[in-house]
Amino acid sequence: IIKDPLIPGGGDFATDDTLNGLYAVKITSTTADYIPDETISQTVAGGTALGQVVSWTRDVPGTVPTPSTPGSGVLKYIQSPQVHQNNGVVRAFESSAANAITGDQSNVPGTVHHDYANGTLLLGCTFNSGLASPELQNNSGDLIYIENRRLITRAPDQIEDIKLVIEF
């Protein structure tokens, strides 16, 4: 939980109940799925934009893109100055149909849907020319609660018993 985050480009506090802290790209003409945690790249003016995939959500759930039937979706990612530098600069991804965004593990090239309607809200992101920025300013606010739980592996047929004792 973050207390008093700022909105980008100003000193005003964010007042919405929920905010998206990820960058996103509306992708079209992809022939496979991007893999979470893989590095993505795009050739941009001055170098290469780099990022790390957080999630890939297909526009049509249940369909798998192939070379014969390309798909589309929303690619959410982060950019960290420690990891995603190119010649000492963290470069932004561009709204260009000419330069594909490619995953380093999946080898998936995807085209930015650069004419995606401006101001369109999809999956919690507001897109402009196929790109969406975070709704809060990076490194703003106070982190007041974090919880990291370890993964618990469960069998599909496992039954959990929960007991609650209330005394007066």
Predicted features along the sequence, with ranges:
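Interface-prone segments of viral and bacterial extracellular assemblies
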Residues: 1-168
